[in-house]
From Swiss-Prot:
Catalytic activity: ATP + H2O + cellular proteinSide 1 = ADP + phosphate + cellular proteinSide 2
NCBIfam families: PRK12904.1 (NF009538), secA (TIGR00963)
Cofactor: Zn(2+)
Cofactor note: May bind 1 zinc ion per subunit.
Positions that bind Zn(2+): C891, C893, C902, H903
Entry similarity comment: Belongs to the SecA family.
Membrane topology (UniProt): Peripheral membrane protein
Pfam families hit by this protein: P-loop_SecA, SEC-C, SecA_DEAD, SecA_PP_bind, SecA_SW
Principal location class: membrane
Subunit organization: Monomer and homodimer. Part of the essential Sec protein translocation apparatus which comprises SecA, SecYEG and auxiliary proteins SecDF-YajC and YidC.
Localisation: Cell inner membrane; Cytoplasm
First-level EC class: translocase
This protein's name: Protein translocase subunit SecA
Amino acid sequence: MASLGAFAKRLFGSSNDRRIKAYKARVEAINALEPDMIALSDDALRGKTAEFRARLADGAVLDELLPEAFAVVREAAKRSLGQRHYDVQLIGGMVLNDGNIAEMKTGEGKTLVSTLAAYLNALTGKGVHVVTVNDYLAKRDADWMGQIFRFLGLEVGVVLHGLDDNQRRAAYAADITYGTNNEYGFDYLRDNMKYQLASMVQRGHGFAIVDEVDSILIDEARTPLIISGPLDDKSDLYLSIDEVIPEIGEEDYELDEKQRTVNLTEEGNERVEEILRNRGIMLEGNLYDIENISIVHHVNNALRAHKLFQKDKDYIVKTGKVVIIDEFTGRMMEGRRYSDGLHQALEAKERVPIQPENQTLASITFQNYFRMYEKLSGMTGTALTEASEFGDIYGLDVLEIPTNKPIARIDEDDEVYRTTREKYEAMIGEIEECASRGQPVLVGTTSIEKSETLSELLKKKKVKHKVLNARYHEQEAHIVAQAGVPGNVTIATNMAGRGTDIQLGGNLDMRLADETAGIENEAELARKTAEVKADIEAKKQRALEAGGLYVIGTERHESRRIDNQLRGRSGRQGDPGRSKFYLSLEDDLMRIFGTDRMDGMLQKLGLQEGEAIVHPWINKALEKAQQKVEARNFDIRKNLLKFDNVMNDQRRAIFEQRIELMRAEDVSDTVDDMRRQVIDDMVAAHVPEKAYAEQWDMAGLKEEVKKNLDLDLPIETWADEEGIAEEEIRERLYSASDRHMASKAAQVGPDLMRQVEKAVLLQTLDQHWREHLMMLDHLRQAVGLRGYAQRDPLNEYKSEAFELFESLLARLRENVTRQLSVAQFITEAPRIEEQPLPEMQAHHTNPLTGEDEMADGDVATMQRPMRNDPGVAADPNDPRTWGKTPRNAPCPCGSGKKYKHCHGAL
């Protein structure tokens, strides 16, 4: 069957081929317009923007404008940047405009491709969001590609960390806005915590182009963006529990590296209970009694911190802080924190100051944020391996765009060694040989620890090299830019999201920026530019003669996509190149995913010390292992999305209601309806339908009415009246409360009353929504255990989350009614104050436990840096610079004492 399928594909072409062929017909139409565009003056070319907008206003659709609009952008790029869109780039632009994903190999000019679809869609006036993975790329692309848009009369904005509301609002008001996924998501959440429409910064979600779309929509799909605020300090408890873990043995817990879980055994539970009692942490009962449930939570986090999380792989300790390492990019994620107490457990383990836990105030996943856009598209070098996920979850098709020139890179079969030592020896020998003949080498590692191990080995061999990983990311763009220089050896943790091309001979733009900075004399500038260009061209020829860039992988990642990204760094724009992975049976993927058969086979082959096995069968076996992991991760993400959709429906309902309330000049009808519903609920609870009068709880009703409506009525005598029923009681309460509120309105005036009602309604809604989020978090963790009772956790979650939502609405009605009824008004109009925004955090959800584990503190906050912000130095002699110091942390003055026994003494 497979051979028949392959034959049919050769005969008729694949689905991808057929769709690309259809686009090629439109490319010819665009090319036919090029002479006309060349003939236009700059002003006439710029005038096309107004012409297109007028045609749209007259009823034209974007597809009708596409050929001419793309031709205009191509000509503008030639005049402003000196770059002309290739035909394949025009195809990429059409794929984006159709709301799909364009897979384009490294070096094919994805950044330039985005300008085509961005310009066309910006003509509608709804705004276009171009999404990048970091601030550096957002600013670079806004400055660089912005030249095209500004040439054509469009405004370009960029949303960066640290901007205030006014700057953000201006950026979003532009025709095209550049920014990171975090910034867009946080701005959406913050907008939904505002109290006035004029304070909001975003203006809708029309069209988004997501660069590195696989990184953002797949790798970070389980990373909710969460706005949170600090809770109470529990440093002592974290430290006390941390001291328990070293006292338990391997027999006391079960560790599953594949599933990334660790649990106490029955013997381990007994051992921990004994230690906790001896230390006075747990006074009575057993570990799983309800009064000890918080201790279980702390023990589990401490166990995970010690047994699952490795220093220099999962995190590093830097300037007294535990900093998370992104497993996909190898970058430090400064400010990000694991949630639910895990980060505090790591801080206790490493004996650094323990920061307080945080409470969720608002959250959204990238999956649900980006699905809000009317049209979504993306670009990446590697998406086909995840095509089914893009289709199932986002409704996006992935199209592979042909390369401008055929790929000349040779991807060699993996070399598999018995031990890590043998693998490194072979790798070092290969690197030495390449460096000696001038071939540039890029070595990809999966962790900081491994990159530094390799660096030490190269130092011993006196091989010059540079290291690119999370510790030195400030210099990464310049290091990558020079990775194609002949003889250069560059070691890098996973290359995802680097965003800078590796050009053979070196990066011309970066060298010119560095070496011509400050030169004002035009003749000197021209001379220096020519000198740099000649030097780079000579070095490029040497690198080409040596075989082009050689990419070496030190082990396979569990995602084929990450491996493909590393390979794709070589062979850009038809350049020659090579790639090879060096593996050992001690590698994580090989060790965890069943290499017993492979080990047995290597032994039977009688491999000698330092020998490797190279065979296509090895590559296929590893690919199958990777496919299994990818399929499992996809299932996990789909399952998590089902749970998050429940919260997303509720979030959308609350946020939409908030917007309606802010838009409304008068919310009195809403408040009146709430008050009447509260009265209905009170009467139903105390005067049951079809019950006799002597069964009515009139004393209870009187008490409730006094508490919620601030009315002292002779309710207890009503039951004695002849023929009275619950309907009449309800009507009497309606009338009495209406008169009560009317008198308040008369006292302060209708305008002030309307302001008070809106302020109370919005602030009470926010408070209850925060509490509701916390309850949903607890519910999400609790329902996971119900599978053991043969009950579907998702159905349980849906049912109970709905009940919680109904409870939220009931409490909201009751509290709004009570606050307005009992309030004593002054005659001065109250101001609806914008609340100071808490620190921003992006939590990472453990795909196996469903717990949110990562918090992104200080990401995209509008506030000035806190005094204890990583970017603000603390002066030991100036307590004003210390910020909020936990009482059990070392005192910042340097005395060596705890803060509570030094400057923090009460």
